Amino acid sequence: MQREFLLNLFKDCDFYELTAENFEELVIEKLPKDFSYKYHFGISKVCIIPMGADYVIKIPFAGQEILDDLEPYEFYYEDFYSANDVIGFSWDYCLTELLYYNKAKKRHINKCFCKTRLLGFVNYHPIYIQERAITFRQKNGDLDYKSEKSIRMEKYCEEHHFRCFDSEWLADVFEYYGAKTFNKLMSFIDEYNIIDLHTDNIGYIGIRPVLLDFSDFAG
């Protein structure tokens, strides 16, 4: 993985007022034709997955298109403003992930998160790189049953006043890391109010359970 090579992939991209509505035109269509990849996106960022790589590239959106209440079928652009407290980057939800990862590192629970770092800037826009993981949904589908360990985990979370957002995955976390790290992770999630942890935002690197999208969203 070469930093300059990866950054150069985006040299022709336009990041001005980048949103979930326009990123395909401004970014995806500008990528080199011989670059093989897949991509997924949400409201705050796009995740580009180079074929065969053990990492993903994340690009934050700057804002979103808002439906105008006064003009039917008309939209206007609005910057994100609540991603973090960093002056000049309060719109950047990928930076939020990097900040959380660094906080987790100080508490020795960073292995519970996909390693995240800033790759660099292209046309004044930040580009991030993150360990590649498989999502819980990709690995397990939509489970329609509860295992015994899942039921035990629900009880454990209730007894310790933890929010039990996916008991099957949490049971894997407990088994892999042990009670001490599990409790520290759950306290971290509660402290920073990381709520949006559905089955596409949690997953695994090999057998290691990880959070792979942990910026949450607040507008």
Task: Please provide the spans of the model-predicted regions.
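Protein kinase catalytic-loop region centered on the HRD/HxD motif
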Residues: K184-N193
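Active-site Asp-x-Gly
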Residues: L67-Y76, E154-H161, S215-G219
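Juxta-kinase regulatory segment immediately upstream of eukaryotic protein kinase catalytic domains
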Residues: M1-Y37
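Short, solvent-exposed loop/turn segments at secondary-structure junctions
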Residues: A62-E65, F121-Y124, A133-R137, G203, ...
